[in-house]
Swiss-Prot record:
<feature type="region of interest" description="Disordered">
    <location>
        <begin position="82"/>
        <end position="170"/>
    </location>
</feature>
<feature type="compositionally biased region" description="Low complexity">
    <location>
        <begin position="129"/>
        <end position="155"/>
    </location>
</feature>
<dbReference type="InterPro" id="IPR001138">
    <property type="entry name" value="Zn2Cys6_DnaBD"/>
</dbReference>
<keyword id="KW-0862">Zinc</keyword>
<protein>
    <recommendedName>
        <fullName>Protein priB</fullName>
    </recommendedName>
</protein>
<dbReference type="Pfam" id="PF04082">
    <property type="entry name" value="Fungal_trans"/>
</dbReference>
<dbReference type="GO" id="GO:0005634">
    <property type="term" value="C:nucleus"/>
</dbReference>
<dbReference type="InterPro" id="IPR036864">
    <property type="entry name" value="Zn2-C6_fun-type_DNA-bd_sf"/>
</dbReference>
<keyword id="KW-0539">Nucleus</keyword>
<keyword id="KW-0804">Transcription</keyword>
<feature type="DNA-binding region" description="Zn(2)-C6 fungal-type">
    <location>
        <begin position="20"/>
        <end position="50"/>
    </location>
</feature>
<feature type="region of interest" description="Disordered">
    <location>
        <begin position="195"/>
        <end position="224"/>
    </location>
</feature>
<dbReference type="InterPro" id="IPR051089">
    <property type="entry name" value="prtT"/>
</dbReference>
<dbReference type="GO" id="GO:0000976">
    <property type="term" value="F:transcription cis-regulatory region binding"/>
</dbReference>
<keyword id="KW-0479">Metal-binding</keyword>
<feature type="compositionally biased region" description="Polar residues">
    <location>
        <begin position="203"/>
        <end position="215"/>
    </location>
</feature>
<keyword id="KW-0805">Transcription regulation</keyword>
Length: 565
């Protein structure tokens, strides 16, 4: 006890809170300086000036992590969080959901009769232009399971890089995903548009649905079961119906799969994981009560399956970001060599070999498009470089060996569209000493030529109204984004860039018109997350132009009207 009392009475050692710049550089203790009042011993011996500066925590202003370091950090962060969330959710909800849903594995007669009664099946893999609703039966749990709230998110995780400085984040606000996130934080009106909350229930104890409601979770699949059919979630007949609906409703938006190759038996034998993810995507729209169960059966890696995981996620699915899944797919692409360029097709190639080769090539092209699209949306650097295959992809749709598919035309067209977007964005980001009017004139001219070329190719392929509208939507989105870069560059001038202002306005309005056409075709709800992001970006950009009306009114009104009309 006496020793303990002596230790309590012993005065604590007080160390200097600061060190001079010389000692900091040497990473040694600064001795004898008395917290900046005198010259330290090291500076005395070296006969140099003893300078004290305040600590600057974090990275130096203007310094950035390399893009490779950022991507690796995001991948590791997303993988760790996905694992931890999966384990905690399984332990918390598996028992309660099993008790409340004893017959999830049994087929639903209402679903079978409802789907087979509608007369629309994909004719030869082609997309029917003006499609009526499917008139599927309603399920009582489907609506509540996917209610949106202020805590859920359907947009890209564009702000997961906490290490970026405030100035970096301000510059990144020009990119669509960050622009939408900023507007959501800025005004509750935008939060209501982009992610509405449920109205509170009546009664004294009413609280927001997002704070009290937790959607039921499915139990994990039993050991040894690899896909939804073997797990008893759906039978083979239901799986075939879901595949038909996927090719009719979902594949026209992503153009990733070939109905001649990707049959139920082929996909199930080749990749249980891909089969599971396709069934999962179909269940999201046509059997939503089975959606969560299918998500838990993913146990093997496949590039196409990762792409589908980024296209159609649940409203409450925050397991990881789209960027992480695309990163996984890009790294797998390097390992398995999907981008191998085959200039001359072997003469002894069988029909199955041709379909499989085209499938590998299509997968890589779609992955390349998705990678460049994310770069445009978020401002991050792309992961896949251009190679021989990409440089020779402008006529890829013609080398199918048979009739040209409209979906393949879209894939080849989008590769060229990403070239135009990346080239223009790079010029503005690097600050090249070129007139913005010249850059814009070149970009808009290329987009006009692209539109003429690929509309002609689509006509030759026999595309429908949906395919032409789909091409137009993405062209208008690129036109809006590239012209917004020039408009932002001229924001400090007394008179804005009228050419860019006119292009931004018309592109945003026309984009929303195309989205309205999708609604009239009854296909809008089947679009991937990118469609939601692009339509939100166009609407928010029009509202931002409205906020800046007073500043733009300083320019000549007649000149503005002439440009817009």
């Amino acid at each position: 006890m006496e020793v303990h009392a002596e230790q309590l009475q012993k005065p604590p050692v007080v160390r200097g809170a600061r060190a001079c710049t010389t000692c900091r550089a040497a990473k040694m203790k600064c001795v004898g300086a008395e917290d900046g009042q005198r010259q330290c011993q090291r500076c005395k011996r070296a006969n140099v000036q003893c300078i004290f500066e305040k600590h600057r925590r974090g990275r130096k202003p203007g310094s950035k992590l390399s893009e490779a370091s950022k991507m690796l950090r995001r991948l590791e962060k997303g993988l760790n969080s996905a694992k931890s969330k999966a384990f905690s959710i399984d332990a918390r909800h598996s028992s309660s959901y099993r008790d409340s849903h004893p017959s999830l594995g049994e087929p639903d007669d209402r679903y079978t009769n409802g789907v087979r009664s509608h007369p629309y099946s994909p004719p030869n893999g082609q997309f029917v232009s003006n499609l009526p609703p499917l008139n599927l039966p309603s399920y009582p749990d489907a609506a509540s399971e996917y209610t949106a709230s202020s805590t859920s998110s359907r947009t890209l995780d564009a702000n997961d890089d906490e290490g970026d400085s405030a100035s970096d984040r301000a510059e990144d606000n020009i990119f669509p995903a960050n622009f939408i996130q900023r507007e959501r934080r800025r005004n509750s009106f935008f939060r209501t548009i982009l992610n509405p909350e449920d109205a509170p229930a009546s009664g004294p104890s009413s609280v927001r649905c997002s704070e009290t409601y937790s959607p039921p979770q499915s139990p994990a699949a039993p050991a040894g079961l690899n896909d939804p059919v073997s797990a008893g979630i759906v039978d083979e007949e239901h799986a075939k119906v879901l595949f038909d609906l996927i090719f009719l409703r979902l594949n026209p938006f992503i153009n990733l799969f070939d109905p001649s190759l990707h049959t139920v038996s082929y996909v199930r034998n080749k990749s249980p994981f891909l089969f599971t993810v396709l069934i999962m995507a179909g269940c999201k729209f046509f059997r939503p009560e089975l959606f969560k169960q299918c998500q838990k059966l993913a146990d093997e890696y496949a590039v196409q399956a990762f792409a589908c995981l980024t296209y159609w996620k649940g409203h409450d699915d925050n397991r990881t970001s789209t960027w992480t899944f695309v990163g996984y797919a890009c790294r797998m692409r390097v390992e398995i060599g999907l981008n191998r360029y085959v200039p001359n097709v072997p003469s002894n190639e069988t029909e199955l070999q041709r379909l499989e080769r085209r499938n590998r090539e299509r997968t890589y092209l779609v992955l390349f498009i998705h990678d460049r699209s994310l770069s445009t949306q978020t401002g991050r650097h792309w992961m896949l470089p251009e190679d021989d295959f990409i440089r020779h992809s402008d006529r890829w749709h013609e080398s199918s060996g048979g009739s040209v598919r409209p979906e393949d035309v879209i894939v080849a067209a989008f590769v060229q569209l990403r070239h135009i977007a990346a080239e223009t964005t790079e010029i503005f980001q690097r600050g090249v000493d070129m007139s913005s009017e010249v850059v814009l004139r070149s970009c808009n001219s290329q987009l006009t030529q692209w539109n003429e070329t690929w509309h002609r190719e689509m006509q030759q392929a026999g595309g429908g109204a949906f395919h032409f509208s789909f091409l137009s939507l993405f062209r208008l989105y690129v036109r809006l984004f590239t012209n917004s870069l020039a408009l932002r560059e001229s924001s400090n001038r007394a008179t804005p860039n009228i050419q860019a202002l006119s292009a931004c306005y018309t592109s945003a309005v026309d984009s929303l018109k195309v989205v309205s056409e999708f609604a009239r075709m009854n296909v809008l709800r089947y679009g991937q997350e990118t469609i939601t992001m692009m339509s939100a970006y166009a609407a928010l950009y029009l509202l931002s132009l409205l906020r800046n009306t007073l500043r733009y009114c300083s320019c000549t009104m007649a000149q503005l009207k002439m440009r817009i009309l």
